[in-house]
């Protein structure tokens, strides 16, 4: 028996599908990498469950700003992306979505995120402005900065001081320590990501940590993972205790060992898989932190 033919998409459905592709809706790993450290900071700042209001603000805000960042990044990189097999089919690169459309969509998403931040307090709103500025600057960093992943690390870590500010009305030293640790994590996983496109980026004259580090890429990635986990462990030890916290950090080290087996040959497939799986490391630490507070 033949199946009924699928109904053709309406113009509106086709446009929506392109916009969802532009913001990587079907690839949640990007916003999950942002979400888990932000939620971890929120739990630590609140000493447990932060309440539904702040949980909603930071979860939705993270997704919206990551989506806005994708729009900005694809506009900035459109002339390079067409020469890279992995990115050549992106909607802005192919012309399926115009530059103007992408910028308008990015602006709308950023404004929605800002509307959420307006429900918090003045210091959180101020930090969000700095976060937006860094987000706008990052796509251009790879043209001028040898380690643009460090710029991304700052951008991806801004949710941490924002979380503390939203809960406490101030940003304590602990927040900056966690942000520093998170910076090393971003350096680790985004260098893995950069290793996927290293040959293309060299040909295009771009700058990435994978190119800058050369054959030191894998050892430095492992050192960055180590710095991330150790900084978070030491910084959080006075605040988060218990067996679940210890188990979570032990599992994090186990995941790093697994990632090493994926990237040691420097194959594109292995490096991309390691990058895509990194959000599980963040999730593991978040569960250890949130679970430890819940079991008190």
UniProtKB/Swiss-Prot annotation:
Q: In which pathway does it act?
A: Cofactor biosynthesis; ubiquinone biosynthesis
Cofactor(s) listed: Mg(2+)
UniProt keyword NAD present: no
Q: Which top EC class is given?
A: transferase
Membrane spanning residue stretches: 29-49, 52-72, 103-123, 151-171, 176-196, 220-240, 243-263, 275-295
UniProt cross-references to Pfam families, sorted A to Z: UbiA
The compartments listed are:
Cell inner membrane
Listed under catalytic activity are: all-trans-octaprenyl diphosphate + 4-hydroxybenzoate = 4-hydroxy-3-(all-trans-octaprenyl)benzoate + diphosphate
Q: Which UniProt keywords apply?
A: Cell inner membrane, Cell membrane, Magnesium, Membrane, Transferase, Transmembrane, Transmembrane helix, Ubiquinone biosynthesis
What are the EC numbers? 2.5.1.39
Q: Which residues form a coiled coil?
A: none
One cellular component term from this protein's GO annotations in UniProt: plasma membrane
Q: InterPro entries, alphabetically?
A: HB_polyprenyltransferase-like, Prenyltransferase, UbiA_prenyltransferase, UbiA_prenylTrfase_CS, UbiA_sf
Which biological process terms from the Gene Ontology are attached to this UniProt entry? ubiquinone biosynthetic process
Topological relation to the membrane, as annotated? Multi-pass membrane protein
Instruction: Please list the GO terms describing molecular function.
Output: 4-hydroxybenzoate polyprenyltransferase activity
Per its UniProt entry, which superkingdom is the organism in? Bacteria
The record's similarity note reads:
Belongs to the UbiA prenyltransferase family.
Question: What does this chain do?
Answer: Catalyzes the prenylation of para-hydroxybenzoate (PHB) with an all-trans polyprenyl group. Mediates the second step in the final reaction sequence of ubiquinone-8 (UQ-8) biosynthesis, which is the condensation of the polyisoprenoid side chain with PHB, generating the first membrane-bound Q intermediate 3-octaprenyl-4-hydroxybenzoate.
Q: What is this protein called?
A: 4-hydroxybenzoate octaprenyltransferase
Whose protein is this, by species?
A: Albidiferax ferrireducens (strain ATCC BAA-621 / DSM 15236 / T118) (Rhodoferax ferrireducens)
